[in-house]
Structures are given as structure tokens and as C-alpha cells.
From Swiss-Prot:
Entry's Gene Ontology BP terms: isopentenyl diphosphate biosynthetic process, methylerythritol 4-phosphate pathway
UniProt family annotation: Belongs to the IspD/TarI cytidylyltransferase family. IspD subfamily.
Protein name per the record: 2-C-methyl-D-erythritol 4-phosphate cytidylyltransferase
Gene field: ispD
Lineage of origin: Bacteria, Bacillati, Chloroflexota, Dehalococcoidia, Dehalococcoidales
Keywords associated with the record: Isoprene biosynthesis, Nucleotidyltransferase, Transferase
């Protein structure tokens, strides 16, 4: 609960694992436990989170049901089928959390989320209705032409690297996802299209997204070091 309203989490785990060299990143073992189990554990154990909607690729739904049962993830109230785009998958998860006042959206392939990020995200979202986890950029970012030539260097001090969770008042994110014909790379971008403010709160460098075998190895190292 947060501000006397239910809090729901959409865990998006319907990706194709194209860069994992044949492994399914969601069920790959991390310290002897599936990546997805690490991710769900953070939300299961969070005192703020009431309900979880888990979004899976169609072919992984039965396997997800087995995992939820094995680890007793009692807050998972729905296992939904994902869509072609990430947006379609999130929309599917949102439909299962209709009675929640606040929504967190998190990548299932980010297993090293710090538990404190959940209340911190909710507190940040309370100020304007939307908030996203982010970390400062470490590298210089340049804009290039279609021919691969550098056109300009972007001001790093005004740029951030965005992570999940992304946190929203439910009415805002539901309205954002009702719009069609807009392709976005993250949830906050749809809120931005509504001309509504989005705050940032501190993410963590350890909150990596597993997309390659090298990421999985790095997650193992971070986990052993206590992140």
C-alpha cells in the first residue's frame, strides 16, 4: 500500500533473448536461481507492493506458473501473455491491475534491483504522478549522421541513462497506454507524449539488464560482491 492505495507491479518478461546465444535470459541461472526468481523476490518481499502481474512470452507461460508455485510468489495474481512490442506486453499487464492506485513497471531481466528503489520510486512519483529510475552517464555521447559521421557531441551533464522500475499513478499510465500509433522505447515516453511531467530518482549501476551472456557473468560477480 502507498497513500492508502494498492500498489501493483507489472514485471515484463516477454522478450525473445535474441542475444543470449540460445539461453532464455529469464530462466538462466544466477547463483543457482533463475533470473526471474531474483526479480520477483524483490517485489514479493516489498511491504509496499500488493499485487504482481507477470507478463511472459506465450511459450513460457506454463514454465512461469511452475516457477511462481515453486517459489511461492503469492503476490502474483496474473500471468499474462506478452505481445509483439514491449508496449503490448505492458498493456496486457496493466489490464490485470485495475484496482491499483499506483503502478510500478519493471524489466524481468533486471534481477539486482535494490529493495529501497521501490519506496523511493513511489515517493518520487507522489510529487507529480510519474518517476523513473536513472543513473548519470559515464561515457561521452555523440550524435551521428546516417553515413556514420559525427554531427555533434551532446551535453553529458543533461543526459541520463534510464532504468526500471518506472513508477506511475495508475490513471496516468492507463491513459498513456490508451493512445495508439505511438512507438516508445520506455513507459515514461508515453507519459511525456501527454505533456505530463516525469521526475527521476536514483537508480543503481548494479541494476543491470541481462541481455547477453556477458551481462549474466557480470550479475554473478555483482551478486557475490553484495552488489
Amino acid at each position: 500500500m502507498f497513500l492508502n492505495e494498492k500498489v501493483g507491479a507489472v514485471i515484463v518478461a516477454a522478450g525473445q533473448s535474441r542475444r543470449m546465444e540460445g539461453q532464455d535470459k529469464i530462466f538462466a541461472l544466477l547463483a543457482g536461481k533463475p533470473v526471474l526468481a531474483h526479480t520477483l523476490s524483490v517485489f514479493q518481499e516489498s511491504p509496499q507492493v500488493d499485487d504482481i502481474a507477470l507478463v511472459m512470452a506465450e511459450h513460457n507461460i506454463e514454465k512461469a506458473k511452475e516457477l511462481v508455485k515453486e517459489y511461492n510468489f503469492s503476490k502474483v495474481i496474473a500471468i499474462c501473455s506478452g505481445g509483439t512490442l514491449r508496449q503490448d506486453s505492458v498493456r496486457s499487464g496493466l489490464s490485470a491491475l485495475c484496482d491499483c492506485g499506483w503502478i510500478l513497471i519493471h524489466d524481468g531481466a533486471r534481477p539486482l534491483l535494490e529493495p529501497d528503489s521501490i519506496p523511493e520510486g513511489l515517493e518520487a512519483a507522489k510529487l507529480c504522478g510519474s518517476a523513473i529510475a536513472a543513473v548519470p552517464l559515464k561515457d561521452t555521447i555523440k550524435e551521428i549522421s546516417p553515413e556514420g559521421l559525427v554531427e555533434k557531441t551532446l551535453p553529458r551533464e543533461r543526459l541520463i541513462s534510464v532504468q526500471t522500475p518506472q513508477v506511475f499513478r495508475a490513471d496516468i499510465i492507463q491513459k498513456a497506454y490508451q493512445r495508439v500509433g505511438i512507438i516508445a522505447t520506455d513507459d515514461a515516453q508515453l507519459v511525456e507524449k501527454l505533456k505530463l511531467p516525469v521526475r527521476i530518482f536514483s537508480g543503481a549501476c548494479a541494476n543491470i539488464k541481462i541481455t547477453t551472456p556477458e551481462d549474466l557473468l557480470m550479475a554473478e560477480i555483482l551478486l557475490k560482491k553484495g552488489r
